[in-house]
Amino acid sequence: MPAMRGLLAPQNTFLDTIATRFDGTHSNFVLGNAQVAGLFPVVYCSDGFCDLTGFSRAEVMQRGCACSFLYGPDTSELVRQQIRKALDEHKEFKAELILYRKSGLPFWCLLDVIPIKNEKGEVALFLVSHKDISETKNRGGPDRWKETGGGRRRYGRARSKGFNANRRRSRAVLYHLSGHLQKQPKGKHKLNKGVFGEKPNLPEYKVAAIRKSPFILLHCGALRATWDGFILLATLYVAVTVPYSVCVSTAREPSAARGPPSVCDLAVEVLFILDIVLNFRTTFVSKSGQVVFAPKSICLHYVTTWFLLDVIAALPFDLLHAFKVNVYFGAHLLKTVRLLRLLRLLPRLDRYSQYSAVVLTLLMAVFALLAHWVACVWFYIGQREIESSESELPEIGWLQELARRLETPYYLVGRRPAGGNSSGQSDNCSSSSEANGTGLELLGGPSLRSAYITSLYFALSSLTSVGFGNVSANTDTEKIFSICTMLIGALMHAVVFGNVTAIIQRMYARRFLYHSRTRDLRDYIRIHRIPKPLKQRMLEYFQATWAVNNGIDTTELLQSLPDELRADIAMHLHKEVLQLPLFEAASRGCLRALSLALRPAFCTPGEYLIHQGDALQALYFVCSGSMEVLKGGTVLAILGKGDLIGCELPRREQVVKANADVKGLTYCVLQCLQLAGLHDSLALYPEFAPRFSRGLRGELSYNLGAGGGSAEVDTSSLSGDNTLMSTLEEKETDGEQGPTVSPAPADEPSSPLLSPGCTSSSSAAKLLSPRRTAPRPRLGGRGRPGRAGALKAEAGPSAPPRALEGLRLPPMPWNVPPDLSPRVVDGIEDGCGSDQPKFSFRVGQSGPECSSSPSPGPESGLLTVPHGPSEARNTDTLDKLRQAVTELSEQVLQMREGLQSLRQAVQLVLAPHREGPCPRASGEGPCPASTSGLLQPLCVDTGASSYCLQPPAGSVLSGTWPHPRPGPPPLMAPWPWGPPASQSSPWPRATAFWTSTSDSEPPASGDLCSEPSTPASPPPSEEGARTGPAEPVSQAEATSTGEPPPGSGGLALPWDPHSLEMVLIGCHGSGTVQWTQEEGTGV
């Protein structure tokens, strides 16, 4: 754990000071806020006050500090006004009055109002203390404190029964927290004296400044840190020189006295002495984390901890030589106690344990220092082995082995006189003392430098390994020390080099994590077979994001921090975005909420940040790099640093789609403001939401949400797939008329049902629609034409549908078999002699005759659908199919002819001869009576509709049908009908008409009459039925004049001996199309 610096943040210790200074006397108090004029609400309530009054803290908080809730009937009104006046004028006030507890019991109270000022000199708080003085007032006072139910006196002194004594914060808890539990009887006496006599100095409600003497050093200050650096160097010097001076001292000097100390030794001793003095004036950190500045507390703390060790280490052994005091060898060993100062370095160096390089350096220094100590001891053992020998020198010591190898052997000589000079052997490891008291002197041996280096080599080889054997232990003492050295070496090797390994791994941890994640990413790409372009994008994005955040997960890192601190960090990280003019009107709380919604984003070159059509979920602020906005390959905008992209603020449930792509040009760093978090923040601060919405429109560099819908409409309108159908739908909606005809698919053929003598109307146009099949009346059984088809066909001009008006065909003659015939479309017949089946529409005037099929092209006026590749390859199959369909059609026609002939015969035999109604043309009289029974109209009752056989009177066909009731005309449909040529005609005249009337809506009797045919007219032949009477009129002239072609009754009716068809007639117009007979169908 790093050393604690202590809690040095400025604090407001007002509450602790109040609890300490006014303990006992002012323990029952409340604090009122003087800034809220008029009310002065209570902001703090002591437990003693709650104990006195019986009110809980929750009941007292935010009430007036005048404590009007304690007033009762005996409370003086004058005192009330004086308290109010003192609070309003921010003055001190003291009074005695009667207050009431929560239980309703009165007590005498000494009330003291004291204003508390802040650092600006303004009154910030009111200290209102309450002291129970009921006992003092009751002594000799009137007897008015008796209870109602008894004669025993009841004093107003509050008891502690029923209350939790641990909650007495003003007297116990706060007093303990302030660190003043020491008994201070004198201080209490002075405070009590000050309450009743002199007033004590009141604390101020402000941040307390650090109170310290100018001669007190802060333990974590710069001056003390510099001094600790000098002490560290001095301690290291002592750790190196003291073992060397003790163990590797020259033995040639006399043992009676030692030489003078060096300058470095004297400087180190002076530093140690000054360090003791400074330690008495240096702050320390208490167990509660507070920094103690009191000199008395500092001295007491230092004396009880490190003082004794520092005094022993600072004994001036070297200074004794300056005062001519001899220091013998035994006393000189006391300098090794200075090595204990190394223990003081551990707490100071612990604060640097977070730096790997510093820890690595310290570990290596410790290992080298231990090796130096082992080398000094090894040299001392070898020296003592030689000096302890008798008359003959030992031959097995490590120094003897070294001397023989270096050819500098040891030898004994007689002791020289005191003033004699050494014979040049002052640099070797010889001893100048007497050998065992024999008067012999040891000389020779290796030099001191060679001996120390060899000893250090042995120490390092023994600590790091088991040694190499070139310097070995020979004597018992040397072997024992070698064993101890190996044990220490094993421990140091594990500790030092284990820590070194951990430190090196920690130094390369980020690099290892990078390679590990890269390897995982490549394995993922290989397993899932990611394509090469996507693989390159993944690797580039990973490398770019790693370069930005160095692999640190900021979300996880900040999650452990409190919300307040995390918001401040987020505001610092996103200050570029929050400094936009868009947020200048936001409060600090709103900015903090918005900063938590911001997320960093990154975009690589060529990467798409947003695709067209994506749902916009955030606003993006470009911090660095450049981007471009694309739409259909066109660059709409280029964005750079400081640009804001996104959309206007949508509603919470609204989804806005992007109208363009946003692509990165370079490596871009962005800040992303999520719309969900933005909505949540604006919901907390609704006053800022309107200004933000208005400002966002002007701050957006490019609005990705503008015109999204119109862009989609434009794109769809350019599509050419459904252009014709879209045009028809528009005309159908707007009610516009035009000659547009929508194409019909091949599987929905339409056949023309109009005869040459009929003209088209809206109903006919609808029947000609390519998506509808012309309805045919079912003649078998009880069937009848569908009512739905009749309703749509006979709607008439009174209620024309808008769709039919838009699809009305232009008037044009059609003198050839129409190409819309089902047989032509299906490929059964060859239209106009053409061998190729085609699907065409006539959009212009055709030629007078269609002897050959016109060539397709723009000038022909035909919309053709050519064969596909598959149809060309299957020509033979289509020919066979066409032939089979033709044969089947012929069989069906023959069967129909037989059924129709049979039906006619049955109806003529079974139907009674009576007058049937006939429609009357406008302006004509009643129908003439029938003169012949065979010429009367024949009515056949089929059970569903009445069918009347009528002569083809021209007035009936050309006239206007009268309608007795307003609205659409009755559902009547005249149909021409001709018998097959194989049967003799049962009719006395050329043609008869079937008139179907609805059972539910019969025609009025006045509008129906019998109109027999003229018996004198001969029956027309087949040729006469086709060409008309002797006065021929060309079909072209009839078409141009709008009148029907001549024939029986003024209308030429089709007559096909091979078939029986029903064609809608009676809807002539002057400008409609004249249809010719289709060969082979009888239409």
Curated annotation (Swiss-Prot):
It comes from Homo sapiens. One of its GO terms (molecular function) is voltage-gated potassium channel activity. It holds the Pfam family cNMP_binding. Pore-forming (alpha) subunit of a voltage-gated inwardly rectifying potassium channel. Charactherized by a fast rate of activation during depolarization followed by a rapid inactivation at much more depolarized value causing inward rectification due to a C-type inactivation mechanism. Exhibits a rapid recovery from inactivation. Residues 137-150 have a biased composition (Basic and acidic residues). The chain crosses the membrane at residues 229-249, 260-280, 303-323, 332-352, 362-382, 480-500. A nucleoside 3',5'-cyclic phosphate binds at residues 582-697. N-glycosylated. N-glycosylation mediates traffick to the cell membrane but is not necessary for voltage-gated potassium channel activity. Detected only in brain, in particular in the telencephalon. Detected in the cerebral cortex, occipital pole, frontal and temporal lobe, putamen, amygdala, hippocampus and caudate nucleus. A motif (Selectivity filter) lies at residues 465-470. InterPro entries: cNMP-bd_dom, cNMP-bd_dom_sf, Ion_trans_dom, K_chnl_volt-dep_EAG/ELK/ERG, K_chnl_volt-dep_ELK, KCNH_animal-type, PAC, PAS. It is found in: Cell membrane. It is a multi-pass membrane protein. GO terms for biological process: potassium ion transmembrane transport; potassium ion transport; regulation of membrane potential. This is Voltage-gated inwardly rectifying potassium channel KCNH3. Glycans are attached at N421, N428, N436. The potassium channel is probably composed of a homo- or heterotetrameric complex of pore-forming alpha subunits that can associate with modulating beta subunits. Interacts with KCNE1 and KCNE3; these interactions regulate KCNH3 trafficking to the plasma membrane and its subsequent voltage-gated potassium channel activity. Residues 773-785 have a biased composition (Basic residues). Its main location: membrane. Keywords: Cell membrane, Glycoprotein, Ion channel, Ion transport, Membrane, Potassium, Potassium channel, Potassium transport, Transmembrane, Transmembrane helix, Transport, Voltage-gated channel. Residues 1-228, 281-302, 353-361, 501-1083 are cytoplasmic. It catalyses: K(+)(in) = K(+)(out). Residues 844-861 have a biased composition (Low complexity). Residues 250-259, 324-331, 383-453, 475-479 are extracellular. Residues 18-90 form the PAS domain. Residues 93-145 form the PAC domain. Disulfide bonds: none annotated.
